[in-house]
C-alpha cells in the first residue's frame, strides 16, 4: 500500500492505491466504520441486456475488493428500476423492456457475478437482491407522500442527467425523471433490511448516490456513505468495454474466452499498469515490475494482463486455452480448435459470399465499409494471405482443413466453418 495514504482502513487504502476512488462522502466517517466489523455496501446494475460487459467490470471489481477486505457486498439487480430506465448519460429514452425480458436478463447477469464474488449466508458472503421486491409494492400516492416530499424539483433539475438533456432540447419523460427517486429509495430500503451503509458506482452516478445518502440520513438518521470510481476510458479516449466489433461481454455465450483474452492483449501501452491495478489481483510490487517493461517487452505485461483477466472471468483452463490458441495463431501460423468459429451454411459458401460481408457477419469488422478500409490498409487476410479486394467472393474453394481462416490485423482471427 502507498505509505502516503490518508486512510487507515484496509478497504479504502486498497482502493486508493489501485486507483478506484473518484469521490467519497463523509470520508473520515466511512474510514472509521471500515476499520470496525464488516460493513455492508452495494452497487446497482440494471438488467438492460442478458449479460454485463467490460464497462461494468470496474464496479464488479470494486465489490470484489470490498469482500477481499472482509466486508459484505450486495449486488442489487434493478428489476424495478429497469422498468423506468436510467437517463444518466443518455440522449434519448431507453427502450422499455417487458417483465419477461428483464427477468431473463437478470438470470444471465447472475452467472457473471459468481465468477468474481463468493455468495452465501456468512457475514462477508455476497448476496443478490432485486429492487422490484419493494418498488413494485408501492402505490403511487403512497410513494409520493413518503418520499416525494424529500426532493425538490429545483434540485432535481440541477442534476446533470436532467440538465444536459434539457439544455440539448432533448425530451425526458416523467417516467425517467422519477428514476433518481427510485434509486434513492433503494439505499434506504437496503439500509433498513440489511444494514447497508455504502453505495458505490461510477462517477456519473454521483448525483443519484447523493440522493440516497441524504434520504437515508434524513428519514432514519442512519449512517450512509457514497463512493464513486472514475469514468474509465482508454489512453486514446475510447470508451471502455466497446470495440469496433461490438461490446466486450463478460459471459462466454456472447463472447468467446479467446476474444476476451485478445481484448486485454490489445491494451494500449499507456494503459497496462492502470488496468493491472484495476482488473487483476496481482500485488502492487509485481505490477510495478510489469509497468517498468519497455519496448517490445511491454507485450509480456499485456499477456499477463490478458491471462489474469481471462482467468478471473472464465477460469484457469479457458485462459490457458486462449493463450495457447493465440500463440499458435500468431507465432506459429497454425490453426487451432480453440480459435473462435463462425458457422455458415454450406450452400451459401458454395454460392459464394462477399468477403466484406463475411468479415462483418463474423464480428471481425463493425461494417462492410470498415472491412473495405481494412483491405485497403493491408490488414485483411484470408488463410494468412493479405487480400486487397474486399468484394471478392469467398467460396468452398477457399477451405483449408475444412475452414476459411479470416484475420483482421495481427490479433483478431475467426475460422469460418461450413455446416
Curated annotation (Swiss-Prot):
Q: Which PROSITE patterns match?
A: S4
Which chemical reaction does it catalyze? tRNA(Tyr) + L-tyrosine + ATP = L-tyrosyl-tRNA(Tyr) + AMP + diphosphate + H(+)
- Pfam families attached here? tRNA-synt_1b
Keyword field contains Cell membrane: no
Binding of ATP occurs at 242
Q: Where in the cell is it found?
A: Cytoplasm
The record's section on InterPro entries has:
aa-tRNA-synth_Ic, Rossmann-like_a/b/a_fold, S4_RNA-bd_sf, Tyr-tRNA-ligase, Tyr-tRNA-ligase_bac-type, Tyr-tRNA-ligase_bac_1
Return the motif ranges for 'KMSKS' region. 239-243
Keyword tags: Aminoacyl-tRNA synthetase, ATP-binding, Cytoplasm, Ligase, Nucleotide-binding, Protein biosynthesis, RNA-binding
GO molecular function annotations of the record: ATP binding; RNA binding; tyrosine-tRNA ligase activity
Tell me the superkingdom of the source: Bacteria
What EC number(s) would the UniProt record show? 6.1.1.1
Q: Where is this motif: 'HIGH' region?
A: 47-56
Q: Where is it mainly found?
A: cytoplasm
- Gene Ontology biological process terms in this record: tyrosyl-tRNA aminoacylation
Any single GO CC term annotated in Swiss-Prot or TrEMBL for this entry = cytosol
Q: Where is the S4 RNA-binding domain?
A: 353-418
Q: How does it assemble?
A: Homodimer.
Q: Which family does it belong to?
A: Belongs to the class-I aminoacyl-tRNA synthetase family. TyrS type 1 subfamily.
Which PANTHER family does its entry note? TYROSINE--TRNA LIGASE, MITOCHONDRIAL, TYROSYL-TRNA SYNTHETASE
Protein name, entry field: Tyrosine--tRNA ligase
